[in-house]
Structures are given as structure tokens and as C-alpha cells.
């Protein structure tokens, strides 16, 4: 507590009526990446005590839903749900409160700390993976995701998992994070609705040629652009960057 009382953001939160100093982390992240906009429908996973909920409501002015195992003291204009985010019934409650799909899913949740770094890092990754799974269920195509992760040897693998699901992904530590903290925030923008993901391998037939002269193969109605390919060719391809409306691929083998 003594450290908190000397902390600039702790004092600022008290003065400005935020429930936690972490409110400024969300403000700073949103200033840089613009994930919450006016009218955004926002879900906050692990929302207690509610600092992020307060900021999300200010930024959005729309529907904001907070979920936590602990009871969240009521906040005006915000729906709070006490429940386990891994349970189907909780997800149904969230969907009902939203009245549709979310535009943004955020999570500043942290695991119960053991003091053993490898254990705490692994627990953080597990929690972040759970948040990603839930975000994929709740978000509309093109929606955004923000989650806190502890840095460590599994972080890069997790970052790659997020990159497979979103068109644009960033890792960022806001100024309000304590200098001694190992936390970092992962931001995913534009949730992909494509039936393919980067790194996947497919056998395809090139259907046509695009304006740039590259071959185009269709996978479940989704266009995949293949360089140096001609119509009628049968190819084994590896998916590269995936966009909202198309993907790129490289040729592994001509069949």
C-alpha cells in the first residue's frame, strides 16, 4: 500500500474517480491503437474491480459488459455478470446482454500468483488463451481484442496464435505499467473470418488469373492469390498472410 500511495497513477485514479490505476493503461493503449470507438459494444473479461469498465464506457458510450468470478460493484450504464467465463451459461449471459456480437473484447485479468516465475508465466498464458478462445466466439468479424500477458518463453508462441486470428497484431507496454512489471499487452485488430490461416497447406486448382497476373484459387469460396501460377494448374500451396477478403500463398509443389 505504501508503494501505491507514492505512485502517480494510483493517486491520479483516486483523484479522478477510477477504481484502479489500470484505467490509465487502457486509456493509453486506446490512444495508440483506437480499438474502442464511439458506439463499440465492449466485453471486459476478468473485469473486477471495474477500472477498465469505467474507461470502456467513457470511450464507447455504448453497451459495456463486465464479467468476473468476483462480484463487481455496480457501475451506471454497465452490465456486470458474476460468473466463470469458461462456462457456457456465462457466455450465453454475455451474448444476451450484448444483444448481438461484440466489437471489442478486452481482458486485464491476471492469474493467482505463486511467486514461482515459470508457474506464473504458464498460468498467464493459459488465461490469455482462454480469453482468445472466448473472444473468437463473441467478436464480430473485423472486431478487436486486447489481453494482458506476462512475458516469458511461451510469449512468442502465444503472439503467433493471435496473429493467426487477426489481420493486425501488436505487443505493447503502456507507460502506466510499473517499470518492474513483466506484463505486456497484445492487441489484435480485424478478427479474420477467412476459412484459411497462415501456415496451412492445401492442394488446389488455380481457377483464374487476377489483374496483376497472379493465379487465383478458391478455398470454400475464399480467394487465395498464388504467384507464378496459371489457370488449370494443380498445386500444393502454403498459406501466407491472410486478409479480410483474400490470402496470399506460395507454391510448395506442382501436382
Swiss-Prot record:
Pfam families referenced in this protein's UniProt entry, alphabetically: FtsJ, TRAM
Catalytic activity: uridine(2552) in 23S rRNA + S-adenosyl-L-methionine = 2'-O-methyluridine(2552) in 23S rRNA + S-adenosyl-L-homocysteine + H(+)
SUPFAM superfamilies in the cross-refs: Nucleic acid-binding proteins, S-adenosyl-L-methionine-dependent methyltransferases
Active site: 148 (proton acceptor)
Family annotation (PROSITE patterns): TRAM
GO cellular component, one term: cytoplasm
EC code: 2.1.1.166
TRAM domain ranges (all copies): 195-253
Family according to the record: Belongs to the class I-like SAM-binding methyltransferase superfamily. RNA methyltransferase RlmE family.
Known function: Specifically methylates the uridine in position 2552 of 23S rRNA at the 2'-O position of the ribose in the fully assembled 50S ribosomal subunit.
Protein name as it appears in the record: Ribosomal RNA large subunit methyltransferase E
Organism of this sequence: Methanothrix thermoacetophila (strain DSM 6194 / JCM 14653 / NBRC 101360 / PT) (Methanosaeta thermophila)
